[in-house]
Structures are given as C-alpha cells and as structure tokens.
Regions:
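Bacterial N-terminal signal peptides that target proteins for export
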Residues: 1-9
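Bacterial N-terminal signal peptides
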Residues: 8-18
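Gly/Ala-rich beta-loop-alpha elbow adjacent to hydrolase catalytic centers
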Residues: 67, 71
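Patatin-like phospholipase
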Residues: 19-66, 76-321
Length: 321
C-alpha cells in the first residue's frame, strides 16, 4: 500500500430508527445495489447508469434501490427519476455541494491520519473477532478524533445536494452504521428522517467527516460494514450490483473482495440471479490514483458511460427476466 490515507479514501471514495439486518428478506423482482467509492465512484456509477439508459435499460424502475456511501447519493437521485443528463451533471459537482467549476472547500485541508481506520478495516477482513465490535471501535474513534469537515458543514452540503428533502416515491434505502455499537441501520422513507440527513450518514467516512446525529444517535459511513451491503437484497429475484471499489489496484480495495463475494453467494443461495459490474480497464485508467480525487470526476463519468453502453446487451438479458 503506497499510503494508508490514499488506500482508505477508497472507502469514501466509499423515525424512529428503521433498523435492518442481514437476515431480513426483501420482496420484489429487481434490486439495484450501488456501492461506495468516493467522488470518483459516484461519477463512474452515474456514467454507467446513463450509458445503460441510453441503450434502453431504465434502472430507475428497480423494485428496490440500495445505496451505500457514494452509492447512496447516486441511488437517491436515480430513485427520484432524475434524467441521465441531470444525473451526470450532479455527479460532476464537487463533494461540498458547490456548483461545478468552484473549488471543493476541503481542497486546502491537510490529509487526515486514517491509519487506525485502515488497521481496523483490515482486521475485519481477516474474519476474526466480532465484526460489529470492530465497527463499534471505529465508531468510538470517529467520535473522538477531529474530522476534516464538521458535522454541521457536512450535513449542510447534503441539504444543498437534496434541497427537496423528501424521499423518492420508489423503494430506496441507504445504509449507515451506529457509531455507538456498530450495528447496521437501514434508512428508508418510513424512517421519519429527512433524506439529506440519512444520505449524509451513509457517507460519513470516519476521520474525514464527522458522524451524523439522528435521533440522539450518531452514525458513520455504511461502507464500514460493507462497500455494497448487497446481502440486504436477499429475497429479490434479480440483483444488479455496481461496485467501483472492486477494480482499483490497491491493497485495501482488494480486501473488499472477500466480503463482497460472500454477499453475492448469500444472494445466489436465496435464488437470486446476480450480475456484478466493476470498472473495466478504461474506467480504471480514468479513476486516477485514488477514488477520492475530485479532478477525476469527469473522466470517470465518461468512462462509466461507455462501459454502461458496452454492458447493455448483457444487462438487458438479466433485467428483462
């Protein structure tokens, strides 16, 4: 690993409380699962979706859309039936919610020390010990350290991204982790939480963004549990998974492969047909060195768009079942 901070950016680069568990089964035919991957992953997923749409495959018609971290942003837009052109324009905007062309407010901030987070994520990858307990350790650390972006600034940026504050009419869920005990939280329209706040909680990368407070609980990035949380779609007949972190040649990214493979097996064992889309060689080249690099949004969108068009024939067979 060239640097711990660079590697962990991949993760960013990943009511009453509506609590979901991996044992819950979903109903419906088609599930779209959008994984985390920072601003570059957000752009790539948006491009893939636009490319598929241009070939006649409308993923917004999914019976269930599950988004984690960057995928939560894309999923909320798609579930709201945002046109492909608007989806791409939104993906090109800086992460702080400023209009395209304006500098990201974090650009002058020093890189955070994420060595603790990296160590804990790699500990989780070994499969030893309680996964939830390790997530709780990460949550405790996230509440203790000084983030690059404060909670108020972070949540405000999501209110700018989603000014309507209303949940989409279609079934859409986003994933976060309770910082106190490491438990999974699945947010939906029935959770009684404003959409921007729920999505922000799914994107609150520990050490970079402050945990997000909802109903006296604090929440961190859903990617701490899984970069896709694909197992939560168990019970659906068909699942399409977009996973931008599965391609980058980085030690931490490779560590995500084992848990994702387990999630895909869980779906398959439940009788679900699964298709996984990961970045192709052209997309990987467009990504640059890290999924956290805002300057690679446009190349990632363009590469994803081409990849989506190229994948359309294969995806059409799955999506039409």
């Amino acid at each position: 690993m060239k640097s711990v901070s660079k590697a962990v950016l991949i993760l960013a680069s990943l009511l009453f409380i509506c609590a979901g568990t991996a044992g819950d089964s979903k109903t419906g035919d088609h599930a779209l699962i959008l994984g985390g991957g920072g601003p570059v992953g957000e752009a790539w997923e948006s491009g893939v979706i636009a490319g598929l749409t241009e070939k006649g495959i409308d993923l917004s018609r999914a019976d269930l859309i599950i988004g984690t971290s960057a995928g939560a942003i894309v999923g909320a837009r798609l579930a709201s039936r945002m046109p492909p052109s608007d989806l791409i324009n939104a993906a090109l905007a800086p992460s702080d919610g400023s209009p395209p062309g304006q500098p990201d407010q974090r650009s002058s901030s020093p890189p955070p020390d994420l060595s603790f987070l990296a160590a804990k994520l790699q500990e989780m990858d070994t499969g030893k010990g309680s996964q939830q307990s390790i997530r709780a350790e990460i949550g405790e650390w996230a509440q203790r350290v000084r983030p690059v972006v404060s909670e108020s600034q972070f949540v405000a940026s999501y209110h700018r991204r989603f000014p309507e504050k209303e949940w989409p009419g279609r079934a859409y869920e986003c994933i976060s982790v309770d910082a106190a005990d490491g438990s999974l939280r699945v947010w939906s329209g029935s959770s009684g939480v404003p959409l921007p706040v729920a999505v922000a909680s799914s994107c609150a990368l520990p050490g970079v963004f402050a945990p997000v407070t909802i109903n006296s609980h604090r929440y961190i990035d859903g990617g701490v549990r899984s970069v896709t949380n694909a197992d939560l779609a168990r019970g659906c007949k068909i699942a399409l998974v977009l996973a931008p972190t599965m391609g980058p040649n980085d030690a931490l990214a490779k560590s995500f492969t084992r848990p994702l493979n387990g999630e895909l097996r869980t779906l398959g064992d439940s009788g679900c047909k699964v298709e996984l889309i990961v970045p192709d060689d052209a997309s990987l080249k467009a990504f640059g060195a890290t999924l956290g690099d805002e300057t690679h949004r446009a190349p990632a969108v363009n590469a994803g768009r081409v990849e989506g068009r190229n994948m359309a024939g294969e995806i059409a067979k799955l999506w039409s079942d």
